[in-house]
């Protein structure tokens, strides 16, 4: 019998399909030679993995440790890693023979009729008992690498889950540091507001005394009282904002706000760290989110090979050892073995399998673009953090002078007003200028510290690429 022509060509087409392997995608993005910011340091030293200690705050150290042990986000990320580990074990199992053991017992009794070969109504054998034991093993020969690719995909997904956990940890610690710094800054702003309120109340007492003696008008008295009321209004606003940061901080730590440790640190005691940014080409090995995107891309590439292998025949080998008897005592008296082999090739479902391959290839293309996006986003994160560090540093140099000159102006205006040589309007202006300058000074100091946190995070927080999971 002659085979149809298209079936004769099937082995050749399968061989050609098996020999064509997918070309691994390239990154397609060349890192720049250096950072755009002129203040970027090209020192090769990585940030310390305990980067928060650079702020010299024992309270921040304590909060980070609480977050490490208590955070529900970190616990959820760890659970996702365990899920990926289980999937990797499941995906690797088909590479090994599947062995099963069976022990069966059955009993049949003829109720009516003439029976059959085992149950004969004309004899006394109206009941049949059998016992069987068997040990079987089956194994699929991985000719096309589909099973190995499925295992590799699961292992790369496991890598991605572990790297995601590192990203969650870095983000969590950065958020804890940011919120803690904001909390201290609000306490400092509250202290400044209280100090300026006392200054405004002292001027109000002076205006009231001058008004009683006829040296000041009712208008001047109302103006100063308005300024005092405005300063009073700032206090509950700042207290509310500080309470909000406490709630946010407690949530990050996985605690109710009532259990949040009491802070006694002063904002001025914090140290501003200088951070070496290195060069852009090093960033690819420093960021866990980039490594996770790369691992997902590798998993998608392996999935393409799995889809390609599904189009090819599968060869399965099997062996079974067994024995059976009519009594349990003789169950191993009649041993036997069975050898099997099977070849299965898709015929009528090739359209579905082709679509599955196209789906895997499209997912690979999507993850390649996501990988490229993560690289560009990482470069942008560092550039923005460097720009913020440089910009705030330059502003603070002038802000310190503004605070000093505003303080001198207020003191001079107050003395001249007491002497009757200056109007209250000048005193009011210098009071407002001093408060605004001091408040802005605290805000800039916070921005400077938060820019350092952002730069630590942008550089990967001291994380280094480990060898992939094997």
Curated annotation (Swiss-Prot):
<dbReference type="InterPro" id="IPR003423">
    <property type="entry name" value="OMP_efflux"/>
</dbReference>
<keyword id="KW-0449">Lipoprotein</keyword>
<keyword id="KW-0732">Signal</keyword>
<feature type="lipid moiety-binding region" description="S-diacylglycerol cysteine">
    <location>
        <position position="19"/>
    </location>
</feature>
<comment type="subunit">
    <text>Part of the tripartite efflux system PvdRT-OpmQ, which is composed of an inner membrane component with both ATPase and permease domains, PvdT, a periplasmic membrane fusion protein, PvdR, and an outer membrane component, OpmQ.</text>
</comment>
<dbReference type="GO" id="GO:0015562">
    <property type="term" value="F:efflux transmembrane transporter activity"/>
</dbReference>
<keyword id="KW-0998">Cell outer membrane</keyword>
<feature type="signal peptide">
    <location>
        <begin position="1"/>
        <end position="18"/>
    </location>
</feature>
<protein>
    <recommendedName>
        <fullName>Pyoverdine export outer membrane protein OpmQ</fullName>
    </recommendedName>
</protein>
<dbReference type="Pfam" id="PF02321">
    <property type="entry name" value="OEP"/>
</dbReference>
<comment type="function">
    <text>Part of the tripartite efflux system PvdRT-OpmQ required for the secretion into the extracellular milieu of the siderophore pyoverdine (PVD), which is involved in iron acquisition. The system is responsible for export of newly synthesized PVD after the final steps of biosynthesis have taken place in the periplasm. It is also responsible for recycling of PVD after internalization of ferri-PVD into the periplasm by the outer-membrane receptor FpvA and release of iron from PVD, thus making PVD available for new cycles of iron uptake. Contributes to resistance against ampicillin.</text>
</comment>
<keyword id="KW-0812">Transmembrane</keyword>
<dbReference type="InterPro" id="IPR010131">
    <property type="entry name" value="RND_efflux_OM_lipoprot_NodT"/>
</dbReference>
<comment type="similarity">
    <text>Belongs to the outer membrane factor (OMF) (TC 1.B.17) family.</text>
</comment>
<dbReference type="InterPro" id="IPR050737">
    <property type="entry name" value="OMF"/>
</dbReference>
<keyword id="KW-0564">Palmitate</keyword>
<keyword id="KW-0472">Membrane</keyword>
<keyword id="KW-1134">Transmembrane beta strand</keyword>
<dbReference type="GO" id="GO:0009279">
    <property type="term" value="C:cell outer membrane"/>
</dbReference>
<feature type="lipid moiety-binding region" description="N-palmitoyl cysteine">
    <location>
        <position position="19"/>
    </location>
</feature>
